[in-house]
Amino acid sequence: MEQARYSNQQSVNPQQKGFGGPGLQDLPKQDPMQNTMEWQHHGYGMDSGFQSSATSHPPSVSSKSRHEDGGEEAQAQGMFEWDAGYGQAYTQEQVDEMNQQLTQTRSQRVRAAMFPETLEEGVQIPSTQFDPAHPTAVQRLSEPSQMLKHAVVNLINYQDDADLATRAIPELTKLLNDDDLVVVNQAAMMVHQLSKKEASRHAIMNSPQMVAALVRAMSNSNDAETTRCAAGTLHNLSHHRAGLLQIFKSGGIPALIKLLSSPVESVLFYAITTLHNLLLHQEGSKMAVRLAGGLQKMVALLSRNNPKFLAITTDCLQILAYGNQESKLIILASGGPAALVHIMRTYDYEKLLWTTSRVLKVLSVCHNNKPAIVEAGGMSALGLHLGHHSNRLVQNCLWTLRNLSDCHRGTDDIEPLLQMLVQLLASNDINVVTCACGILSNLTCNNSRNKMIVSQMAGVEALVQTLMKAGDREEITEPAVCALRHVTSRHPGAEMGQNTVRLNYGIPVIVKLLHPPSRWPLIKATVGLIRNLALCSANHAPLREQGALHRLVQLLMRAHQDTQRRSSMGSTGSQGGNYADGVRMEDIVEGTTGALHILARDSHNRALIQGLNCIPLFVQLLYNNIENIQRVAAGVLSELSLEKQGAEMIEQEGATAPLTELLHSRNEGVATYAAAVLYRMSDDKPQDYKKRISVELGNSLFRGDSVPWGDPLDMPSDNQILPPSSMGGHPPDPGYPQPGSVHSLHSNHGEYRQPPPPMQGYHDGTGPIEPMMQDLDLGGGGDFGMDPGLPDMGPPASDLNLDSIPPADNTGLAFFDTDL
């Protein structure tokens, strides 16, 4: 017999520990015996548990293989390796006994898998599972039956809960309205327990009388436990829209806000979380909370020290303040900004920091809250988290800083913030770079200390690299150019910054921004930057080689033509009205002329400017009603008049009459430039003519004390310049920003706006490009030198000999204006 033959050699227990161990694995792969053994191990030699016939038996593992006929040699080899793999032999009787045991316990195994609760305690059922990671067929088939059983049990329990609650609610409602406080307390506790189960919770929220009774009990009871149970029930109901509606209709919001003064932590938690759910999901809740004084109560709660509680409270404040100016003012009056800044400095719980930064972001667009946040140290507090791993927190901090940055007046130390902002310029996140550029631009505006810090921290190099990477993204290039414009003028390190731009190959990139597709706000900022770079004589040649002069003249002519055309169409008023993309064309005229004035200090540039046939336009600008344009036009003519040919061309264009008129200007800069040009034009004139000019210049430049002198030499800062509408000019274009942050978003609903699209933000206010004139340099190095300071000349005389004035330093009449 086949069974006997295998048994005499080596019988094998299919449940033996180590089945399929090293002995089987050592068989050669090509050996047919190994294939047979693996087949028996994985599928055939295992009891499936579903042979239900009384006469069936598990197949013996010693059955003859079909590979047995492969020859005595192969069979002998298989038997040898089989013996080597196992150290213990089983007799046929033992194998039969184990097979019989498996057959007898088959039904018990099925019952244990599908209905384990029906087995008697202590009964041991042999398992046929070899690998815990691979369930048997019975175990797999039992899963659906177990799920069905649990579903039936849940349905039975749910129905029981629902029936119980439905029968109990009327009685519990009556008890909640009882005059006996003990009865009310017990009823509140029972309702609270019922609200923890879903079925009974639905029954409670479907009873308006029950919810109203809970609200009354919560409001009128002085018992802490009753209040806690009632508030806990409302908290459970607030997780469902139907529950929120019933709480709202029953007047639950005023009652919940009253609980915000409770000294009990659990009551506070129930109240604030329920209010939070109402604010998020129930229409009308925001107004109800405001009317009930919820904002004041919530701000008072900011002094608590539970981070998770504070996170919910600050999120409520954000929901209430967003888009509602009245709420922002209430938060301000309640001391909210200082409390929020304290949270940003004190805690490290990410969710709390995120929700708090969201409130600050909403408040940062309010002109009343901005100074309060800054004075409380909000700038440095927000800067602490710019290196946080949470991207959403970093982004909120940057947005808030951008909105606040125009309000900073050096009240706190922001050097670490500036250092972090310079580092963020290297970020791969466009939003981060956009915000960082805008913040740097605002913080360096009219702030010499911040300019120095940024320059010393390699900020100029970082800004140039940012321009190179930004390409045509004007939401980045415009604030970056503005920041560069600020750090290259009016501080001790300005000249170093001007050189740094050139040494980092920034001039080609900057000049390129004067060309399309750049729009007017970016062009305006770039013109101002080029004007500052031209203050460094080493930059004159690179700017000329990159075609800066040609492009500046083109922009000047285009802007002037646009101004003339719009004026002829009926635009009146000398201070504005000609806007394009929110930029006054008069500002472009002034900026380009001012840049050409500084570039004209170089003799090669003067020759190039003369060859571009723009002297007639400069002369025409002398008639302009805007004083700043008169000043820069006279300034560039004073440089061009250094060359004899230039002076002759200026005279041929009829400049004598307007220049003579400008000698009487109340602006000292205009009068001084006009005098210089007239003097140089008179060089080759007869002596009598020169004498008359000298007398005229003397009477104009040396006015007596009884005659009112002109305006102060210094231009007002950017914070003193009034908007066009306040000066009687044309009302500003809707896209033109009003005074305030030139790089912040000012809108009643601007709290969550993404970084603005190109040219929608970062406009440069209403002032002239920074700085139009840093000094009244009347030129030098030519044959017609003149000291504008005119030192110790004494009183006016009838005959003033200007030839006797020696050449001197031309910085005596330093003329500073705004960083805008």
From Swiss-Prot:
What GO cellular-component annotations does this UniProt entry give?
A: cytoplasm; cytoskeleton
* Disulphide connectivity of cysteines: none
Q: Name one GO biological process term.
A: cell adhesion
Q: Which GO terms describe its molecular function?
A: cadherin binding
Q: ARM repeat ranges?
A: 157-196, 199-239, 241-280, 283-322, 367-405, 406-445, 448-489, 495-535, 603-642, 644-683
Show the segment(s) annotated as Disordered: 1-74, 708-811
Question: Do you know which PROSITE patterns this protein is assigned to?
Answer: ARM_REPEAT
Q: Which UniProt keywords apply?
A: Cell adhesion, Cytoplasm, Cytoskeleton, Repeat
Query: Which residue intervals are annotated with compositional bias (Polar residues) in the record?
Result: 1-16
Is Repeat there in the keyword field?
yes
InterPro entries linked to this entry = ARM-like, ARM-type_fold, Armadillo, Beta-catenin
Q: Which residues form a coiled coil?
A: none
Main localization is cytoplasm
**Pfam families found in the cross-reference section:** Arm
UniProt keyword annotation of Cytoplasm present: yes
- Give the compositionally biased regions (Low complexity): 52-63, 785-796
Subcellular location(s) of the protein: Cytoplasm; Cytoplasm, Cytoskeleton
What the protein does? Binds to the cytoplasmic domain of the cell-cell adhesion molecule E-cadherin, and perhaps to other (membrane) proteins. The association of catenins to cadherins produces a complex which is linked to the actin filament network, and which seems to be of primary importance for cadherins cell-adhesion properties.
Name the protein family: Belongs to the beta-catenin family.
Q: What is this protein called?
A: Catenin beta
Gene source species = Tripneustes gratilla (Hawaian sea urchin)
